[in-house]
């Protein structure tokens, strides 16, 4: 046999279920309460620091965490009754002092956006009750607000609607024309009844005239032109001409000759009026006689007329025609005054006419329509207009007009008139009418649902800063102020697709609040988290909300998402999608949802971020799977890696609580009401994954909730009916419980669970029992776990001799007691836990290409094991040998031939040699540390006798 030796350079590759001969160097059979670290080696997990004892609500609870900043971090719970409780794992009070483990008050009906009026019978938020399982409530923290979503609540609209149409019209004069009648036909839109009017188109005038008050002596005093305004708006001009003629009776005497006047009238029709016909009957007229201002009486007769039909069931407004004389000016005020006077003269119309600038405004309590036979003279705007150019500059404040644009509905929009010095939303009803000059602004369709029902939408938990009243601050349960739809209609600015549906998840992406509802993804307006309506119905902008559908042949219900560099990865139960854009701009015109892959996803869990990749849990079959999604691109499928393959038979099916620390490269997996937590450690150098290791932790109690905040792994653990919050410093913090000694520069973590400091003054010693004791502090709740005390400091009186002293403790009545006199130092009280490593069978191994090949045919007898440790204190080794008793030995990490007085039994580097003298296949090697001191395994060098059993390897 040949004497050989071989080194296993590290044991940081974690647990593997592969056969031992296939394991890579560095993998182990079991790894309990350890953390693989590519730099430090296989280290004992940190002990937990007691944060506080808490009293949660009863029944099923939803747990969540809130991170405000490095000094203010909280854990909260929501009960099925809607009750919320919050505890600070770290916060600063009103005096700036750091406190932890304290309960923070929660108020339900105060502050901006209060929930007042939406509380249940217990005084809690009505929106947050009525759920059963914790996955039915989802949380999202943005800055100092935490949003809570109840997946059982159906989103609805309120009955709040935009103001209904006011029955009104605005008539704007377009031109001022002579001899024109500015007529209006006002009718009931539900009636098709017509009225018939007659208008003269030609007149004749009798040649016989009579006159009075003037002489008839050839002086022609009665001749002249005169415009006659006859009844029913008939207007004509009479031109009376005169020729003096010799009176025949006086012709015999030339000296006494007399002359007489001979008048010849001519008529010119200027406006034919109404109801003038060639045959008078009933209300129609045929002739009109008029005496001029000079006494000439003429008679005109209608010789031609036309018949006019119009819809004017309410009023036929027929003001006098405008003047045709050049010396008479035509003004808009005159025309409008005539129109108003004509309308006011008609009884029982119910119409109020108001002159505004060059416009006439009409209002009626019930619907009416208005048009004009003279469309070139004026424009009429009622509830609709073809374009913005048709709108006047003066109007009633609050009048709404639909701009039709074309026959298509998707280019319609609505404008409201805003009078100068008035505010939109005030004085818009007829009772508080305002008129004047102003501008037209965009508005929603009248009588349109405009408000989301806040009682059916998410609520938020907002922290109120500490004050004299609430020294540690408090949390306010509020309903966000969801902005109303202020433009468009259901076509141009439709309701978000979550209306009438349930919201599964809230996310935050590209400065937008994202809601997942059914197979739809809906985002808010950019930079406005509580607005899900477009800013304008005239066009689409990049800041408008996005509403997209995930099309698939499978039933698609989106449950969660996680942001990656290329977009937002979305998860349904059996497919994954990505929200992304090919443009520099992200908006409704550029956003799209791409299919990524089809893997089952447990929607009761959460996806986790793993730096540049994402991870998710699959819970089909007898064991769960953990997948990593890598190389996530806009186009093409990502690379899916089953990272849990090495522990495929060990990974529990009931894993529902993943949480990650991206900075430390750790993902923790927990199962509710179990004390075991699985962990996956990863580390990459460039494009290469240098470390990916599985390990498991055993907690002192059953796990209720866990999270990672700023390099601290926090757990809520239960024992019986008692609960603790505890923190594990994944990376050493300024307040991490450590041990050091004046004789050494090294500082080591203390490895106890639920640690708390017991001050020297709180410790008493009994000379009779020779035991020290203290009152059992809060949080000592774990049954079946071993209590211990450990002296980690020379404080308060610089007593260095006791540093490193350790004793097991027990509860006696209301006290904790332990052997010896410990009254000289402050000490640490906590629970011991075991660091355990089971190594695989040792084989002679050699490289075969990039793989390691184990020689399983040779004969190998292990003689000695040289364990090279990093920081290590009290350690145990156990060799299980087939057919023989186990060989267990305990070691202190001291060089006994060079040992300083009062030196800690902890070394920064130490080698422990364990004799074996056993065939490799009969040997199982275990390492264990149950002491508060550290344990860090770097490598193993074994020595043994090797024989290839005379076979030549081929």
Q: For each predicted feature, which ranges?
A:
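N-terminal beta-propeller domains
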Residues: 1-92, 388-557, 621-637, 879-884, ...
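Beta-sheet repeat architectures centered on beta-propellers
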Residues: 2-71, 622-624, 628-954
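Beta-propeller and closely related beta-pinwheel folds
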Residues: 48-60, 480-511, 516-665, 669-708, ...
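Short linear interaction motifs
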Residues: 56-60, 114-137, 165, 481-504, ...
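Hydrophobic/aromatic beta-strand positions that recur at structurally equivalent sites within the blades
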Residues: 66, 87-92, 149, 158, ...
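Hydrophobic or amphipathic alpha-helical targeting/insertion segments
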Residues: 93-95, 100, 105, 122-181, ...
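Long, charge-dense tracts
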Residues: 138, 145, 165-175, 252-257, ...
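Extracellular Cys-Trp
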Residues: 208-213, 222-237, 440
């Amino acid at each position: 046999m040949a004497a050989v030796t071989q080194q296993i350079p590290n044991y940081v590759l974690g647990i593997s279920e592969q056969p031992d001969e296939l394991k890579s160097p560095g993998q182990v059979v079991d790894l309990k309460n350890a953390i693989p670290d590519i730099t430090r080696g296989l280290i004992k997990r940190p002990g937990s620091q007691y944060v506080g004892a808490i009293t949660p609500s009863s029944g099923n609870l939803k747990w969540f965490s809130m991170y405000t900043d490095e000094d203010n971090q909280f854990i909260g719970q929501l009960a099925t009754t809607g009750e919320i409780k919050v505890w600070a794992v770290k916060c600063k009070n009103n005096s700036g002092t750091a406190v932890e483990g304290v309960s923070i008050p929660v108020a339900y009906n105060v502050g901006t956006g209060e929930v007042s009026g939406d509380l249940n019978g217990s005084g809690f938020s009505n929106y947050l009750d009525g759920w059963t399982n914790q996955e039915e409530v989802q949380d999202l923290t943005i800055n100092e607000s935490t949003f809570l979503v109840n997946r059982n609540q159906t989103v609805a609209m309120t009955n709040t609607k935009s103001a209904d149409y006011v029955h009104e019209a605005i008539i704007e004069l377009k031109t001022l024309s002579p001899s024109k009648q500015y007529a209006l036909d006002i009718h009931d839109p539900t009636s098709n009844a017509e009225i018939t009017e007659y208008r003269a188109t030609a007149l004749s005038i009798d040649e016989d005239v009579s006159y009075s008050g003037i002489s008839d002596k050839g002086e022609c005093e009665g001749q002249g032109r005169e415009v006659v305004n006859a009844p029913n708006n008939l207007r004509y001009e009479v031109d009376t001409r005169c020729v003096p003629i010799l009176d025949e009776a006086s012709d015999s005497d030339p000296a006494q000759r007399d002359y007489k006047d001979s008048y010849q009238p001519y008529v010119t029709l200027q406006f034919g009026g109404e109801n003038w016909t060639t045959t008078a009957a009933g209300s129609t007229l045929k002739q009109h006689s008029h005496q001029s201002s000079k006494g000439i009486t003429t008679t005109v007769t209608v010789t031609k007329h036309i018949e006019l039909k119009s819809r004017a069931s309410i009023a036929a407004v027929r003001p006098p025609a405008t003047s045709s004389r050049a010396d008479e000016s035509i003004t808009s005020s005159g025309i409008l005054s005539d129109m108003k006077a004509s309308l006011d003269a008609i009884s029982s119309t119910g119409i109020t006419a108001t002159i505004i600038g060059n416009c006439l405004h009409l209002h009626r309590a019930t619907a009416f329509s208005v048009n004009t036979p003279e469309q070139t003279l004026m424009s009429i705007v009622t509830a609709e207009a073809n374009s913005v150019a048709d709108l006047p500059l003066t109007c009633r404040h609050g009048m709404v007009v639909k701009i039709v644009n074309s026959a298509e509905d998707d280019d319609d929009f609505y404008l409201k008139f805003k009078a100068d010095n008035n505010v939109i939303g005030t004085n818009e009803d007829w009772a508080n009418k305002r008129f004047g000059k102003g501008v037209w602004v965009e508005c929603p369709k009248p009588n349109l649902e405009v408000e989301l029902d806040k009682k059916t939408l998410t609520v938020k938990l907002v922290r109120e800063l500490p004050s004299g009243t609430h020294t540690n601050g408090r949390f306010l349960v509020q309903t966000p102020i969801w902005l109303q739809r202020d433009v468009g209609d259901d076509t141009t600015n439709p309701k978000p697709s979550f209306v009438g549906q349930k919201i599964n998840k809230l996310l935050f992406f590209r400065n937008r609040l994202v809601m997942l509802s059914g197979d739809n993804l809906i985002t808010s307006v950019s930079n406005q988290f509580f607005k899900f309506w477009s800013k304008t119905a005239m066009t689409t902008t990049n800041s408008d909300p996005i509403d997209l559908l995930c099309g698939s042949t499978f039933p698609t219900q989106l449950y969660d998402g996680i942001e990656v560099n290329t977009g937002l990865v979305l998860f349904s139960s059996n497919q994954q999608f990505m929200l992304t854009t090919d443009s520099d701009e992200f908006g409704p015109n550029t956003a799209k949802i791409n299919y990524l892959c089809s893997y089952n996803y447990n929607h009761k869990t959460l996806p986790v971020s793993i730096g540049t990749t994402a991870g998710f849990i699959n819970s089909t079959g007898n064991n769960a799977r953990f997948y990593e999604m890598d190389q996530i691109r806009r186009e093409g499928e990502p690379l899916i890696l089953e990272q849990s393959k090495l522990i495929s038979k060990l990974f529990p099916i009931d894993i529902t609580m993943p949480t990650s620390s991206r900075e430390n490269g750790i993902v923790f997996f927990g199962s509710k009401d179990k004390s075991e937590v699985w962990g996956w450690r990863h580390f990459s150098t460039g494009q290469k994954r240098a470390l990916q290791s599985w390990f498991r932790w055993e907690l002192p109690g059953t796990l209720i909730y866990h999270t990672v905040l700023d390099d601290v792994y926090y757990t809520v653990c239960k024992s019986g009916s008692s609960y603790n919050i505890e923190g594990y410093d994944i990376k050493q913090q300024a307040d991490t419980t450590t041990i050091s000694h004046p004789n050494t520069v090294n500082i080591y973590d203390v490895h106890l669970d639920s640690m708390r400091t017991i001050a020297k003054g709180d410790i008493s010693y009994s000379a009779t029992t020779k035991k020290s004791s203290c009152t059992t502090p809060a949080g000592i709740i774990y049954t079946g776990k071993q209590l211990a005390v450990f002296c980690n400091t020379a404080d308060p009186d610089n007593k260095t001799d006791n540093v490193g002293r350790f004793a097991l403790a027990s509860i006696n009545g209301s006290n904790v007691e332990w052997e010896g006199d410990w009254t000289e130092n402050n000490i640490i009280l906590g629970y011991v836990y075991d660091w355990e490593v089971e190594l695989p069978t040792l084989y002679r191994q050699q490289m075969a290409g990039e793989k390691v090949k184990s020689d399983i045919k040779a004969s190998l007898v292990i003689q000695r094991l040289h364990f090279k440790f990093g920081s290590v204190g009290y350690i145990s080794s156990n060799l299980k040998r087939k057919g023989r008793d186990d060989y267990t030995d305990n070691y202190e990490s001291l060089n006994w031939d060079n040992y300083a007085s009062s030196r800690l039994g902890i070394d920064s580097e130490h080698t422990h040699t364990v004799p074996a003298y056993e065939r490799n296949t009969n040997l199982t090697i275990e390492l264990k540390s149950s002491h508060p001191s550290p344990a860090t395994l770097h490598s193993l060098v074994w020595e043994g006798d090797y024989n290839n059993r005379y076979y030549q390897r081929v």
